[in-house]
Amino acid sequence: MDKTRQTELVRWLKQHSTSAKRWLRISMLLGVVSGLLIIAQAWFLAVILQALIMEHTPREQLLTPFILLLAVFVLRALLTVIRERVGFRCGQVVRQEVRNMVLNKLQALGPVWVKGKPAGSWATIVLEQIEDMQEYYSRYLPQMYLAGIIPIMILIAIFPFNWAAALILFATAPLIPIFMALVGLGAADANRRNFVALGRLSGSFLDRLRGLDTLRLFFREKAEVQQIRESTEDFRSRTMEVLRMAFLSSGVLEFFASISIAIVAVYFGFSYLGELNFGSYGLPVTMFAGFLALILSPEFFQPLRDLGTYYHAKAQAVGAAESLVTLLESDGEQKTETGDKTPQDKPIQIEANKLEIYSHDGQRLVGPLDFTIEPQQRIAVFGQSGAGKSSLLNLLLGFLPYKGSIKINGDELKELCPDKWRALIGWVGQNPHLPEQTLIENICLGKPTASEAEIQQAIDDAYVSEFLPMLPDGLNTRLGDYAARLSVGQAQRVAVARTLLKPSRILLLDEPAASLDAHSEKRVMHTLNQLAQQQTTIMVTHLLEETVNYDQIWVMANGQIIQRGHYAQLSQSEGPFARLLAHRSEEL
């Protein structure tokens, strides 16, 4: 990572501290008050020791300083607790803001773009890398200011009593940040490499875990174990690199702080022996001045030590910020354009003219296409894998950029508000996704205010009621991760019930019967065919017999519509559809 990039990332991190500026200021104020209490604590200790050792003052006369000293101890402890909570709140506010930005960005980019990375990599970015920014905001930023303020306060407290001790501290203090910077020059880059290795490990491990059955069927266990072992070893070595730099930096800090404190102690020792006679403005060096300086000397370097400790929090945050900034600035070579126009709430007509669909990296996937879909017309789309069928659906969902024109009821798609347009879409894919915890929450995902009668109608029409009695808690049954309690067919029926419950103007179906058993396939397709009669429908499918009553059938290949017409027309004429039908008949 070059210096310019690192500076940009630090600037980005500081910009996002504005949302927590109030908490940051409170944390700094508490730190300054804590610094004043440190000076007061040293002052009372020095007064008590001077009185007891040099002046032989009776203890009864020192009751007030003892009480004040105890009060300072209690106040410092309270301030430490409060400051920890304020610091945590400061980091929490920023983390929530950044996480919302990342999630909104992923939503804007759409699932097509997100699928370009393994799920484990996204989990690392959204969870771990954002969490690793916590200490930068809660500790490093406040400490960056306190590291300059508190030492100056301590110098001001010592200087009136002994300028030599103050001068020693003043002269040695700059050595710590200088050597800290030299030692930690590559810390941000090391943290960045560590995050990359962690993302790679998370992605590969999660993908292998999900595909464990397939790997075992093809005897790939040993090869994949070796790959995970290599990723783990890479992550281990990069983690140890970060720790090595952290320990080296801490060692440098402790060394120079110890040397400086030792010089102050030697100075006062020789002064008390009469060997040195300077530093106290021509007066004898008092025990009070010596105790005050020696008690405050470690506290003088403590903010700098803390800054050195938290410096690695900064390096960690910079390393995490690189992938976050890269994500937030990502639009691909082709950006999905959106508008704010409200779509017309009426039966959907779609008209495409010289339509070309592109991936986010600028590759043309489909086109050019010219077609018109009339209101409540049903279209079935066939084609080999990679023909462009799913890309067409993803375009209509607003997840892919395009050139040319595609109009919805006369309005250009890119001019419509994406959220309002998607609110008119009913969607069932081939891999049902049930993100909520319970069955009822997943069914009501698109319409949380649905009545009991509407819910009952949806689960009856989608044949969810067939397996509902087998679930332990009925509609309130927890489904587990990836809907583990349900079979694929049952999960697809839940997805259909969710679509039935949500009012829509256009129905998009992407292989809704894929991977289903015969019983579930029959149930799902019967329900969807009934639903398709009520609205404009585009269905990508491989089930030829389900398209007999559809208004048009499109056959796609290499991003083009190479044949279109009604089932009876296409089955009787020469072409890809007739060949596909003949091939299917031979299989049966």
Swiss-Prot record:
Is Cell inner membrane there in the keyword field? yes
PROSITE patterns this protein is in? Answer: ABC_TM1F, ABC_TRANSPORTER_1, ABC_TRANSPORTER_2
Compartment(s) where it occurs, according to its Swiss-Prot or TrEMBL record: Cell inner membrane
Example GO CC term: the record gives: plasma membrane
Q: How does it sit in the membrane?
A: Multi-pass membrane protein
Q: Where is the ABC transmembrane type-1 domain?
A: 24-316
Q: Where are the transmembrane segments?
A: 29-49, 62-82, 149-169, 170-190, 250-270, 276-296
Superkingdom in the source lineage: Bacteria
Subcellular location, principal = membrane
Q: Where is the ABC transporter domain?
A: 350-583
Recorded hits in SUPFAM superfamilies, A to Z, give: ABC transporter transmembrane region, P-loop containing nucleoside triphosphate hydrolases
What keywords appear on the UniProt entry?
ATP-binding, Cell inner membrane, Cell membrane, Membrane, Nucleotide-binding, Transmembrane, Transmembrane helix, Transport
A molecular function (GO) held by this record is:
ATP hydrolysis activity
- Offer one Pfam family short name for this entry: ABC_membrane
Q: Which residues bind ATP?
A: 383-390
Q: Would the keyword Manganese turn up in this protein's UniProt record?
A: no
Family classification: Belongs to the ABC transporter superfamily.
Q: What does this protein do?
A: Somehow involved in the cytochrome D branch of aerobic respiration. Seems to be a component of a transport system.
Q: What is this protein called?
A: Transport ATP-binding protein AarD
Species of origin:
Providencia stuartii
By which gene is this protein encoded? aarD
